Amino acid sequence: MAKLIVYVLRLGHREVRDKRVTTHLFLAARAFGADRVIYSGRRDEKLGESIEKIVETWGGVFEIEYQKDWRKTVKDWKSQDGEVIHLTMYGLPIQEVIAAIRQSHRDRLVVVGGAKVHGDVFELADWNVSVTSQPHSEISALCIFLHELFKGKELARTFENAEKRIVPQAKGKKVMRRKSGKFRPN
């Protein structure tokens, strides 16, 4: 079976106001198993540069893309038989729908809001999913959703072509750096 694709669509990025939140959302998406992030709102070249540096240093394949028209992105995804999952505090509880979402063999576009989310998102989504029905960040909702989707397997993922790797320690820090194709202590 081919690997399922998971993309994250960040709605309504605002360059000055959302810079840190959007960057953290993208880092979380990468760490928790998404293949790519797409964002709408204000184009921000520095976002791409920041994420590219992380991928160079810590490895893996992860892409960032800007799309001005989020509706077109969602409609194109659906027209290619992709599934759209909108994370919202108003949706169905994750614990009630995650098994059905996992059973789908369609590629997934996980939509997370920024500022006020347009009502069309709720109608276009195949799933409106809540991670608690309480206000919290889109970052925490995305992390919990991806963790549940992948059943925790994303936590043991290895990122290929990394320049650095962490060696887990009970105390202290240990980082290995790639030198001459092999990892050696820093």
Residue ranges and their predicted role:
Residues 170-186:
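Long, charged alpha-helical interface segments
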Residues 47-48, 71-74, 94-95, 118-119, ...:
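Short, well-ordered alpha-helical microsegments
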Residues 22-25, 34, 39, 111-112, ...:
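Long, contiguous hydrophobic alpha-helical segments, chiefly transmembrane helices and signal peptides
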Residues 121-170:
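Structured adenosyl-cofactor binding patch, chiefly the S-adenosyl-L-methionine
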